[in-house]
């Protein structure tokens, strides 16, 4: 029925009309066909909320007051919840707001692997682990698409650096692609049923991703049976014939000469001249029409399409829920947290990030937030009343051009470099101003009962188009933290950032709380956790290393090169490498503390048959032995006995459970054959491997609480 309807429309379209549907006719829209009631496709950036309205043919915010929206926590924050239900809730907010703003496609979520902590867009991505990405991207897509909006999962594939992203050739072996870089996208297609997917800027093994037959035609269309729409990243197409023959459906660009795009007039001419088959154009239009039909943009269900809503109270509650579970208590010696802010006490909040807002920066992730509660606002709002809260910036941020004024997309095809320059502030050197700010902060700290430092990064560093030079904290923050810890040893250090940073003071700090960019209610959530109103339950979705020299992308492979980047580390990405090499990292993958305590007991591992296939049932008991209700994420790792050239273990399942004080619950997961498989380059598929496996259950990749062995034999092994 659906395909018949599509074919009937296709017969009515002229070649010119079909060409008009497969390239941009505005910066964020395509051309419709009014005579056949085919509307344009309206798209929006959206990793952290629906982006502001842009002019059709100019990279300029149109200046309306109707595009203020809910500001969601970034994908790194969502991943840190380890909560599938919250990932879906975030998707629901994004999808409903996109519809409310009249959008058909939201360009989200981003799921590229966090290969290096220096990638400028890591805050837009979820994790270093493909399995965790799979588990969270599927419900997020479902949440978006329940609102008759297409999710557009990006960037396919291996877009793990910003340096020379348009032209860098990413060299990755087949096994690493299949086991690390493809699984998130495959799950998005096969399980999440994403209606759209964005091709990446970079080349992959010599082919531009948006014009790659092996990537789009073979892997995506043939192997994964994707029948949705492939959209190019803006300006990622470079050849008419290659684009026409690949599985790309829609070319978008940063330039305003829409008819000059490769899949516009040049393609029209090539088809008319007999150089390119019109059937290739038909297939692209067919995919677009299919998506439109599923979105109720056309067809008999058109009048039943959801209308959406934005800036609702329900959305604000949802993003607060996500923010609360995203924050990670990295360290808490001597029970410094939660704070005991008694009546009449003096609280010092120090650090420029305490008063900063982040919604208006980062590149295509920027939005016009209806509001944003900063950490300082959140602390003042919660403590208020009889507690005196004072603020000092502690360090100075040099003036830079407002992020909202920077034309990120228009500059996306240019090479940018991250450089540091000397600055002056009010006629004095930056160093002089920094020393004044430091002295003011230390004096305030000494005069206070409680000291909270809020530092980290901002979108000068976590930003599209640039990779960081190193993991160091900017603006002399290490000096500020050292001075505060010396003056007040119980100073609570809060980091607000989009990617890991060096923490040379970590051994001295008693309490460290980490927050990714946590959305419009981030400051509220931070204050609730500091005060104990909310018990932290976030876990790291990436390893926090001490500095970039520990990262295999830098020591074994290459990162940040401008022409060719070699992923020589293969599957040894993130904790797979660090745990195998017993690297002394700062905080391991999966780590995150609570104000209560949990114990694991009674591990049971049972081999069983399901639908003719062998599975392994893993169960254990988890008890809250502390005095507060809390949530724990139970992580299950599989460790093969034969480890040659393989990670020592890999995450294969997890469950997040809420427990009242003294409560015990039984956790049960089913491991399937794929969880004991390796990619076979001869058979071109994952193959289960016979042998002895250790099943590890724990609170992080290095905090293994229970383990047991099982011998497995697979018919295909």
Regions found by a protein language model. Give the residues of each.
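Glycoside hydrolase catalytic-domain context in secreted enzymes
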Residues: 1-681, 685-702, 709, 714-717
């Amino acid at each position: 029925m659906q395909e018949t309807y599509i074919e009937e429309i296709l017969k009515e379209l002229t070649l010119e009309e079909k060409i008009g549907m497969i390239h941009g006719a505005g910066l964020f829209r395509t051309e419709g066909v009014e005579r056949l009631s085919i509307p344009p496709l309206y798209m929006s950036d959206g990793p952290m909320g629906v982006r502001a309205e842009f002019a059709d043919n100019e990279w300029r915010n149109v200046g309306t007051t109707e595009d203020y929206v809910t500001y969601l926590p970034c994908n790194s924050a969502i991943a840190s919840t380890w909560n599938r239900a919250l990932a879906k809730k975030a998707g629901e907010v994004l999808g409903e707001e996109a519809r409310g703003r009249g959008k058909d496609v939201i360009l989200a979520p981003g799921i590229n692997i966090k290969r290096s902590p220096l990638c400028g867009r890591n805050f837009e991505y979820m994790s270093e682990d493909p399995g965790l990405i799979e588990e969270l991207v599927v419900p997020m897509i479902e949440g978006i698409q329940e609102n008759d909006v297409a999710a557009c999962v990006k960037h396919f594939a291996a877009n793990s650096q910003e340096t020379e992203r348009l032209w860098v050739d990413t060299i990755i072996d087949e096994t690493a692609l299949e086991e690390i870089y493809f699984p998130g996208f495959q799950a998005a297609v096969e399980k999440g049923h994403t209606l759209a997917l964005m091709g990446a800027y970079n080349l992959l093994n010599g082919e531009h991703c948006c014009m790659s037959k092996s990537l789009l035609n073979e892997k995506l269309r043939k192997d994964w049976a994707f029948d949705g729409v492939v959209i190019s990243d803006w300006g990622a197409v470079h050849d008419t014939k290659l684009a026409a023959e690949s599985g790309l459906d829609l070319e978008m660009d940063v330039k305003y000469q829409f008819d000059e795009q490769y899949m516009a007039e040049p393609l029209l001419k090539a088809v008319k001249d007999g150089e390119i088959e019109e059937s290739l154009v038909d297939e692209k239009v067919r995919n677009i029409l299919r998506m439109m039909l599923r979105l109720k943009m056309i067809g008999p269900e058109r009048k039943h399409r959801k209308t959406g809503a934005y800036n609702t109270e329900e959305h604000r509650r949802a993003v607060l829920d996500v923010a609360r579970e995203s924050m990670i208590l990295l360290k808490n010696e001597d029970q410094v947290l939660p704070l005991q802010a008694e009546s009449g006490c003096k609280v010092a909040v120090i650090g420029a990030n305490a008063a900063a807002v982040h919604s208006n920066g980062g590149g295509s992730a920027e939005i016009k937030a209806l509001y944003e509660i900063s950490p300082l606002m959140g602390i003042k709002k919660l403590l208020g009343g009889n507690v005196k809260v004072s603020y000092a910036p502690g360090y100075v941020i040099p003036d830079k051009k407002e992020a909202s004024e920077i034309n990120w997309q228009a500059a996306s095809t240019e090479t940018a470099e991250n450089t540091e320059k000397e600055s002056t502030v009010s006629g004095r050197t930056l160093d002089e101003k920094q020393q004044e700010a430091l002295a003011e902060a230390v004096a305030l700290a000494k005069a206070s009962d409680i000291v909270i430092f809020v530092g980290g990064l901002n979108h000068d560093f976590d930003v599209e188009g640039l990779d960081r030079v190193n993991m160091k904290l900017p603006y002399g923050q290490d000096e500020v933290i050292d001075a505060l810890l010396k003056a007040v040893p119980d100073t609570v250090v809060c980091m607000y950032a989009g990617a890991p940073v060096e923490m040379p003071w970590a051994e001295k700090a008693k309490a460290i709380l980490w927050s990714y960019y946590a959305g419009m209610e981030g400051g509220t959530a931070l204050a609730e956790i500091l005060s104990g109103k909310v018990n932290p339950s976030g876990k790291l979705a990436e390893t926090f290393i001490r500095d970039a020299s520990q990262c295999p992308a830098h020591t074994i492979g290459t990162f940040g090169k401008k022409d060719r980047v070699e992923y020589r580390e293969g599957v040894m990405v993130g904790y797979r490498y660090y745990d195998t090499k017993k690297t002394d990292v700062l905080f391991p993958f999966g780590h995150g503390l609570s104000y209560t305590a949990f114990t694991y007991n009674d591990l049971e591992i049972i081999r069983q048959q399901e639908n003719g296939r062998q599975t392994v049932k893993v169960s254990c008991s988890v008890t809250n032995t502390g005095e507060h209700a809390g949530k724990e994420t139970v992580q299950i790792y599989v460790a093969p006995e034969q480890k040659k050239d393989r990670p020592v273990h890999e995450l294969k399942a997890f469950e997040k459970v809420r427990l009242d004080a003294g409560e015990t619950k039984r956790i049960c997961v089913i491991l399937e054959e794929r969880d004991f498989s390796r990619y076979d380059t001869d058979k071109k598929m994952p193959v289960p491997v016979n042998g002895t496996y250790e099943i590890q259950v724990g609170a992080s990749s290095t905090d293994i609480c229970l383990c047991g062995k099982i011998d497995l034999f697979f018919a295909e092994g």
